[in-house]
Amino acid sequence: MLTIRLALGGSKKRPFYHLTVTDSRNARDGSHKEQIGFFNPVARGQEIRLSVNEERVNYWLSVGAQTSERVAQLLKEHNKTKAAA
């Protein structure tokens, strides 16, 4: 089953996550089919906290991909901020 989930990147004490589409059986940071955005939980100042390629997210959801719980929360947050802007 395809899953849209977070893959850990960044450096020590500065986590950075990529939103990736991968098979649910792959390792968290293993191979992925496509990277569709990023999440920076410790963004400061003018740094972008969340970036999502909505067109690709909608495509992967239409072909049956499932989102992880955290990614579902992030997408909901992204939609709220987009609607408010």
Swiss-Prot record:
Keyword Ribosomal protein: yes
Any GO BP: translation
Classification of source organism: Bacteria, Pseudomonadati, Pseudomonadota, Gammaproteobacteria, Pseudomonadales
Organism: Pseudomonas syringae pv. tomato (strain ATCC BAA-871 / DC3000)
Keywords for the protein's UniProt record, in alphabetical order: Ribonucleoprotein, Ribosomal protein
UniProt protein name: Small ribosomal subunit protein bS16
InterPro entries in the cross-refs: Ribosomal_bS16, Ribosomal_bS16_dom_sf
Pfam families (alphabetical): Ribosomal_S16
GO molecular function terms attached to this record: structural constituent of ribosome
Domain of life: Bacteria
GO cellular component: cytoplasm; small ribosomal subunit
Gene: rpsP
PANTHER family reported in the protein's UniProt record: 30S RIBOSOMAL PROTEIN S16, SMALL RIBOSOMAL SUBUNIT PROTEIN BS16M
Keyword Cell division: no
Family assignment from sequence similarity: Belongs to the bacterial ribosomal protein bS16 family.
